Amino acid sequence: MTALAMKKWFNTNYHYMVPEIDDETNLELVGHTLVETFKEAAAAGVKTRPTILGPFTLLKLATYHGEKQAEDFYQAAISAYSQLFTELSEAGCEWLQIDEPALVLDLSQKEIQQFEALYQSLLSEKGTLKILVQTYFGDVRDVYQELIRLPFDGIGLDFVEGRKTRDLIEQYGFPKDKILFAGIVNGKNIWINDYQQSLNLLENLGSVAEVVLNTSCSLLHVPFTLTNETSLTSEVKDYFAFAVEKLAELNDLKKSVKIKLPHKQ
């Protein structure tokens, strides 16, 4: 049996195994790992927001063998994700994060229409579950207008690598009924944050949206904490911020800016 191809995860040094799909592939929910992990954390008194890769990115990054293409599996994806929505809701989950980093890629008009149709159907099945769609590694210039029209409860945007993110909000606005998860602390590098730049950005955003402070992407790209770096001098450490320190930076920013923060991050 030939191994799956391995590709870089967007512009990072992480790699992923490329899914291979043929005309006989069945796309369905298998197992209950995400739900059971949520329950385990809840039992320990830890409130979590489960996170899963979204169907648009999953199917866009796959390799296809046969006549069928991504759009031919959308209905099966809607069924599988809807089942997950139900199970998480029954377990007491309030928020689910769906990562759709493929939205920062160059998208054709056909792909944009497919994305919109996919989520119009999928979000009609969410019930009381709140859905955050999270993007990262760039801006969503090709699909921003469609994205803000969809009935997501929260939208996560990258202000670090997303060069057009701020311009998009200024040009097209941001819905008052949604929460903006603003990725203003770099989640990929190991350097300290520019507080003044972040504060200036947040002051401008505060008038157009409810804002949650966020990192630009997952913190899996950086080391855990500087506390373990005992061989570094304090002078050197002053330039660095690892995962724990970046969370502290978010807390510092929260204390420093007068905007409404409806949901702790």
Residue ranges and their predicted role:
Residues 1-265:
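Domain-level signal for soluble alpha/beta catalytic cores
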